Amino acid sequence: MVDSKKRPGKDLDRIDRNILNELQKDGRISNVELSKRVGLSPTPCLERVRRLERQGFIQGYTALLNPHYLDASLLVFVEITLNRGAPDVFEQFNAAVQKLEEIQECHLVSGDFDYLLKTRVPDMSAYRKLLGETLLRLPGVNDTRTYVVMEEVKQSNRLVIKTR
């Protein structure tokens, strides 16, 4: 995790920011096309991309898959409240949830509950099984609340990167 006090992004120049914006739009863009879009020749552009990778600004490249084609069309968010009386309950929960492939995201949050999970499953029957056989049995789980998504209005992984 990056120390937020250091704010490494403040040292990026306009070209670095443009490179990151273009790669967010299309991670498969060729270096030649990327260099044209950001106003560099190919070699310095590739050197900048490699530097951004080394420095951790670019963590990897991935394909965006259509969940409806892959038997994962039901999107569910789950609030988890832990039994805070148990020792090391947060660490145990964190370790256990890391092993669950069905959980796409797990966030420790402030508020009336402890964690917000995002999961995708084929249907409600599969979710009921996941909840009853897995989530409720995770270390320290005291309570859950389920929110089934009826419609995905907006979905994006893009970060806002100001080009100044």
Curated annotation (Swiss-Prot):
GO terms for molecular function: sequence-specific DNA binding. Residues 12-73 form the HTH asnC-type domain. Keywords: Activator, DNA-binding, Transcription, Transcription regulation. Residues 31-50 bind DNA. GO terms for biological process: alanine catabolic process; regulation of DNA-templated transcription; response to L-leucine. InterPro entries: ArsR-like_HTH, AsnC-type_HTH_dom, Dimeric_a/b-barrel, Tscrpt_reg_AsnC-like, Tscrpt_reg_AsnC/Lrp_C, Tscrpt_reg_HTH_AsnC-type_CS, WH-like_DNA-bd_sf, WH_DNA-bd_sf. The keyword Transcription applies. It comes from the Bacteria. The keyword Transcription regulation applies. Pfam families: AsnC_trans_reg, HTH_24. Homodimer. This is Leucine-responsive regulatory protein. It comes from Salmonella typhimurium (strain LT2 / SGSC1412 / ATCC 700720).
